[in-house]
């Protein structure tokens, strides 16, 4: 998940002087913000600070990231003519600042860097809706009513994702994560028909890079098996599904990531600690488990609680199939 953000005083200090667009397009700022959680929390990996629409924004599609709203598209893409705005993405020309930031981080970070990109469905939902949505009505109307056009759009966006992540690995990223934040809006039937072919191609075309490939979506408990079928090495499980239930839906050779409910941390450490141990217990000490939040860090979370989460996982997490004393599944 995105580790940096408004929960960190040091991030807020940077944002007091620089807009979000500056932070994701100026390599020095990107590198600093990406590194902040590593310094403060002692996490085992960093994830590139960026936004899922950064590539299409840098291609001139007409996307603006508005504070408190998210990505907003001036002219939504809803016709065949609109697709011409999704041209071939050239990372070294359109967004050279990303590789520059990755190279800086790869040289200086004490932990591995995870590259970051949006999945075609989620990026398409922003481009078609014109911004965040609760119903995805325009997106689904295009998907159901113009299937050929829909697959053309997602194929182009898959090309963008592939190019972006390949460039990040070339610059030094040691793993990559594909975020399908809004895939949970789809039924398994629709995901399999309208999204899975494109997700499968993404992971296939990243396979030769030899780095772990992570697939994550929000509200995707019913899609976990399909997300694994796309071919990633790791599938992220959000907080809505008990981790052991989610793992049961995955093939035995696929690793899993998750899945502490982020908002639990708002309750303080006494509430959070047993929930951390519950996640560890449900993982069963598996070497395939990557402990993580079930989504991003909420702005109101106390950084001190997150530091305690990391320390507890380091102290009591296991990878040999055993559990530390006191690590139990909550009733």
Feature locations, PLM:
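Active-site loop segments of alpha/beta catalytic cores
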Residues: 1-4, 94-331
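N-terminal basic, low-complexity leaders that serve as flexible interaction/assembly modules and, when applicable
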Residues: 1-67, 281, 303-331
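Generic structural "secondary-structure junction" signal
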Residues: 3-6, 10-16, 25-26, 54, ...
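Short, basic, glycine/proline-bearing loop/turn elements
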Residues: 11-24, 80-91, 208, 228
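Glycine-rich, proline-tolerant flexible connector loops at the mouths of alpha/beta enzymes
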Residues: 45-67, 77-78, 84-91, 117, ...
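A charged helix-plus-loop insertion that forms the helical arch/lid used to bind
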Residues: 63-79, 133-140
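A gly/proline- and charged-residue-enriched helix-loop-helix capping module
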Residues: 68-108
């Amino acid at each position: 998940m995105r580790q940096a953000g408004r929960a960190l005083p040091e991030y807020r200090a940077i944002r007091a002087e620089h807009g979000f667009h500056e932070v994701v397009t100026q390599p020095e700022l990107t590198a600093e913000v990406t590194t902040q959680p590593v310094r403060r929390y002692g996490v085992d990996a960093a994830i590139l600070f960026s936004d899922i629409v950064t590539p299409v924004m840098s291609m001139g599609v007409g996307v603006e990231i508005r504070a408190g709203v998210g990505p907003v598209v001036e002219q939504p893409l809803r016709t065949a003519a609109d697709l011409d705005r999704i041209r071939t993405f050239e990372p070294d020309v359109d967004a050279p600042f990303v590789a520059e930031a990755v190279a800086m981080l790869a040289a200086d970070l004490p932990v591995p860097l995870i590259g970051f990109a949006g999945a075609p469905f989620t990026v398409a939902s922003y481009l078609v809706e014109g911004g965040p949505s609760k119903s995805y009505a325009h997106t689904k109307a295009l998907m159901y009513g113009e299937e050929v056009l829909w697959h053309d759009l997602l194929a182009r966006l898959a090309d963008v994702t592939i190019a972006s992540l390949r460039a990040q690995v070339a610059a030094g990223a040691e793993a990559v994560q594909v975020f399908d934040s809004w895939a949970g809006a789809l039924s398994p039937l629709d995901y399999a028909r309208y999204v899975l072919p494109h997700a499968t191609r993404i992971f296939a075309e990243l396979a030769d890079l030899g780095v772990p490939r992570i697939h994550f979506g929000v509200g995707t408990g019913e899609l976990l098996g399909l997300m694994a079928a796309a071919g990633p090495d790791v599938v992220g499980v959000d907080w809505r599904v008990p981790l052991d239930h989610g793992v049961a839906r995955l093939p035995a050779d696929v690793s899993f990531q998750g899945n502490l409910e982020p908002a639990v941390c708002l309750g303080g450490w006494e509430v959070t600690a047993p929930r951390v141990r519950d996640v560890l217990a449900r993982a069963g000490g598996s070497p395939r488990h990557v402990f993580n939040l079930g989504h991003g860090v909420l702005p109101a979370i106390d950084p001190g609680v997150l530091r305690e989460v990391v320390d507890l996982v380091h102290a009591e997490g296991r990878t040999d199939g055993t559990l530390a004393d006191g690590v139990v599944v909550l009733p």
